[in-house]
UniProtKB/Swiss-Prot annotation:
Covalent cross-link (Glycyl lysine isopeptide (Gly-Lys) (interchain with K-? in acceptor proteins)), residues: 76
Keyword Protein transport tagged: no
Placement of covalent cross-link Glycyl lysine isopeptide (Lys-Gly) (interchain with G-Cter in ubiquitin): 48
SMART domains xref list: UBQ
Keyword flag rRNA-binding: no
Family: Belongs to the ubiquitin family.
Molecular function, one GO term: mRNA binding
Protein name: Polyubiquitin
Pro-peptide positions on chain: 457-458
Species: Petroselinum crispum (Parsley)
Note: For the sake of clarity sequence features are annotated only for the first chain, and are not repeated for each of the following chains.
Keywords linked to the UniProt accession: Cytoplasm, Isopeptide bond, Nucleus, Repeat, Ubl conjugation
Gene symbol of the encoding locus: PCUBI4-1
Length: 458
């Protein structure tokens, strides 16, 4: 059947569709006709925004129905704001909007003055001068709107030493906020504070109102010992070592403690938890290692093995490695020998490009294997090309590559002749002689590939 799509400029587009087409399909057809990427399209019918996965039939869209097309500003996105009454407000925002801007939009919609609004996301109160991007608020995130009661109230916090602190708070303050106020007054970091009221330990994301804490209530403050805890380390001989650690200890620190107890040099230690080899710079907290967790200690045999790395110039480098070395480690060894930064190195073995986090063992690289080193030219970067079928192709390119070059790379990967390719970026069709830099296409940008029908009239 035919339907019509009306744009804000007043232009009407005619599309051939079927009732079973999804909104994604319709947006792809609009992209074919108009070159507008689907992620910049919002379709409205009968006052409702249409969701990608649903079909025309779901919305009772019939032949000769008219949809309205609204363009999302680049970086533009929708977020939701939920009030304490349960009402949800939808806002059009951009990542660069400040919290002030968002409060002004809420005022426009709901009439609530910004100075009475407190916005909460992920248990944190948002500060006016910061942006949505600062808080990693992404499209379709939900913020919570709490109204500031004019005035607030006082509560008391009693420490184990018997000292009482007075705080100015509001019922809508979260426990995080209260701990931050205690830190301001007393210098105690929030992660060392435990607050107790009516015999219950209070959770960070909840509000005072949630716990029915009212004016002049008294909370009790108990100090958490600095993340201190015991963990166990089990060796292959079956021996178990007990260590005193903190969540913030790095794996290096833990290996040093093992050396103190057992005399094993850190460079011969490999620590395993939950089947994963632990990396030196990371902390116990990063791996969610908690009190009384058991790590497994495997000794690295001194010696390892030799492998060869062959460069495009024909030079061969010899490296001392171990099967458990990651590709990152190997690149670091190449940097030590040759001075080539890891981010300019691509390593190939058995025709496969090797990924940084994987080990030599993962790729079955054994002693005296030969890897091939290809240099990524500076300015080299990856971009993505998305086809109408939804497939995404990854290409290695440079900013100075022309659109012709990119089409040739797509032909190499996919077999599609360049004269059948149309590339779209930011709603624009890209011209052959221009470069990626001309269009401000940067690393990890996504281009859209539309096929020119043979004999088409583009």
């Amino acid at each position: 059947m035919q339907i019509f799509v009306k744009t804000l400029t007043g232009k009407t587009i005619t599309l051939e569709v079927e009732s079973s087409d999804t909104i994604d399909n319709v947006k792809a057809k609009i992209q074919d006709k108009e070159g507008i990427p689907p992620d910049q399209q919002r379709l409205i019918f009968a006052g409702k925004q249409l969701e990608d996965g649903r079909t025309l039939a779901d919305y009772n869209i019939q032949k000769e129905s008219t949809l309205h097309l609204v363009l999302r500003l680049r970086g533009g996105m929708q977020i939701f704001v939920k009030t304490l009454t349960g009402k949800t407000i939808t806002l059009e925002v951009e990542s660069s909007d400040t919290i002030d801007n968002v409060k002004a939009k809420i005022q426009d919609k709901e009439g609530i003055p910004p100075d009475q609004q407190r916005l909460i996301f992920a248990g944190k109160q948002l500060e006016d001068g910061r942006t949505l991007a600062d808080y990693n608020i992404q499209k379709e995130s939900t913020l919570h709107l709490v109204l500031r009661l004019r005035g607030g109230m006082q509560i008391f916090v009693k420490t184990l030493t018997g000292k009482t602190i007075t705080l100015e708070v509001e019922s809508s303050d979260t426990i995080d906020n209260v701990k931050a106020k205690i830190q301001d007054k007393e210098g105690i970091p929030p992660d060392q504070q435990r607050l107790i009221f009516a015999g219950k330990q209070l959770e960070d994301g909840r509000t005072l109102a949630d716990y029915n804490i009212q004016k002049e209530s008294t909370l009790h403050l108990v100090l958490r010992l600095r993340g201190g805890m015991q963990i166990f380390v089990k060796t292959l001989t079956g021996k178990t070592i007990t260590l005193e650690v903190e969540s913030s200890d790095t794996i290096d620190n833990v290996k040093a403690k093992i050396q103190d107890k057992e005399g094993i040099p850190p460079d011969q230690q490999r620590l395993i938890f939950a089947g994963k080899q632990l990396e030196d710079g990371r902390t116990l907290a990063d791996y969610n290692i908690q009190k009384e967790s058991t790590l497994h200690l495997v000794l690295r045999l001194r010696g390892g093995m030799q492998i060869f790395v062959k460069t495009l110039t024909g030079k061969t480098i010899t490296l001392e490695v171990e099967s458990s070395d990651t590709i990152d480690n190997v690149k670091a060894k190449i940097q030590d020998k040759e001075g080539i930064p890891p981010d300019q190195q691509r390593l190939i073995f058995a025709g496969k490009q090797l990924e940084d986090g994987r080990t030599l063992a993962d790729y079955n690289i054994q002693k005296e294997s030969t890897l091939h080193l290809v240099l990524r030219l500076r300015g080299g970067m990856q971009i993505f090309v998305k086809t109408l079928t939804g497939k995404t192709i990854t290409l290695e390119v440079e900013s100075s590559d022309t659109i012709d070059n990119v089409k040739a790379k797509i032909q190499d990967k996919e077999g599609i002749p360049p004269d059948q390719q149309r590339l779209i970026f930011a709603g624009k069709q890209l011209e052959d002689g221009r470069t990626l830099a001309d269009y401000n296409i940067q690393k990890e940008s996504t281009l859209h590939l539309v096929l020119r029908l043979r004999g088409g009239d583009f």
